[in-house]
């Protein structure tokens, strides 16, 4: 089998294609969630706590000296990324919960009695009838 034919078969397997689609959709979903957090959630939240832009939260570890730039820890961006993560994790949790519900197997109905059980039941019933009719 040629290398390219083998690769094509590998790439066209259902699970590989599904994974690729999932990665692409996940990347797009990540952008949507980032925009939701940055543009929709954080501005009102910042307004509620005093008109603060979370992106501006930073701690200067060392100020700029001459040509040496300042060393700054931007913890506001980190807070925003934590919000991103929580929303994405919650959405994935909900999606997995729905998928698990859809894939949940319905309990099988109990099978009826086997042929042997039916036959033995009939024999038992016949023996009971015969014993009832005896004096």
Swiss-Prot record:
Similarity-based family: Belongs to the MscL family.
Species of origin: Cronobacter sakazakii (strain ATCC BAA-894)
One Pfam family matching this protein: MscL
HAMAP family on file: MscL
Function, in words: Channel that opens in response to stretch forces in the membrane lipid bilayer. May participate in the regulation of osmotic pressure changes within the cell.
Keywords recorded for this protein, A-Z: Cell inner membrane, Cell membrane, Ion channel, Ion transport, Membrane, Transmembrane, Transmembrane helix, Transport
Compartmental location: Cell inner membrane
Phylogenetic placement of the source organism: Bacteria, Pseudomonadati, Pseudomonadota, Gammaproteobacteria, Enterobacterales
UniProt xrefs under InterPro entries: Mechanosensitive_channel_CS (IPR019823), MS_channel (IPR001185), MSC/AndL (IPR037673), MscL_channel (IPR036019)
Cellular component, GO annotation: plasma membrane
Protein name: Large-conductance mechanosensitive channel
Quaternary data: Homopentamer.
